[in-house]
Amino acid sequence: MTCGIRYGQVQKIAFTRIGNLFSDASNPITELASWSAFLAAEDSTKIVVTPYVEAPTMEGGDEKTFGGGNATLDGIIMVLGSQPIRMSFALRNYPQTIISALKILMKIKDLGVFLFNDNGGIICLQEGDTYQPIPIRALFVGDLILSGRIQPDRNTMKFSFKSNYSDKLVVVKPNFSPVNDLANIDVHIGDGSFALAFNPSYDI
């Protein structure tokens, strides 16, 4: 019997373009040096990591149906597939320079994510001996919501996964702590590499 998989709470998100991947042979996903190379990049291979995200929620995933009643045989509905998943997060007390940078990612085509959980794992897609980001669509980063003295100020971030996104989903346990050992996006805003790497001209 196979042991159950604990996906855990998503605590940070790494954004990159689809096509950037880790390979067991050349740049293992479990090694900090492999990630450091992607984080240091100044071109379309760059990866950037958010600070902590909170209140992760997922909606959707229900079946798409047609018919029922007199429209279909025996009144039984037809299942046409599944709805996409919409995931949302609260970005609490973020400097708005980071929010502004995340909004630039809304313009980038073919974007994907690696999700870092509370158990030190990396949630991603596996194809043979390669590990790839999960493709996302419809990234949205909202403006600041001031909450006064009642609760922390926050921005909202949302994106969608396509149907069947989780068919090849795995949790990888690396030899380092993704949430603690990988530099956040603000470092790459400050050194100028974010602006170089996430220039929409790469995607035209």
Cite the ranges covered by each PLM segment.
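Short linear motifs in intrinsically disordered/low-complexity regions
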Residues: 25-28, 44, 63, 75, ...
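Short, acidic/charged, Gly/Pro-enriched secondary-structure junctions
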Residues: 90-131
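Generic "edge-of-domain/loop-turn" microfeature
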Residues: 54, 94-96, 120, 141, ...
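Mixed-charge, glycine-accented linear interaction segment located at domain edges/termini
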Residues: 133-200
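A structural detector for beta-sheet-dominated domains
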Residues: 16, 40-41, 50-52, 90-92, ...
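Residue-level detector of short, conserved catalytic/binding motifs and their immediate flanks
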Residues: 87, 111, 157
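Solvent-exposed edge beta-strands and adjacent loop segments
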Residues: 1-88, 132-154
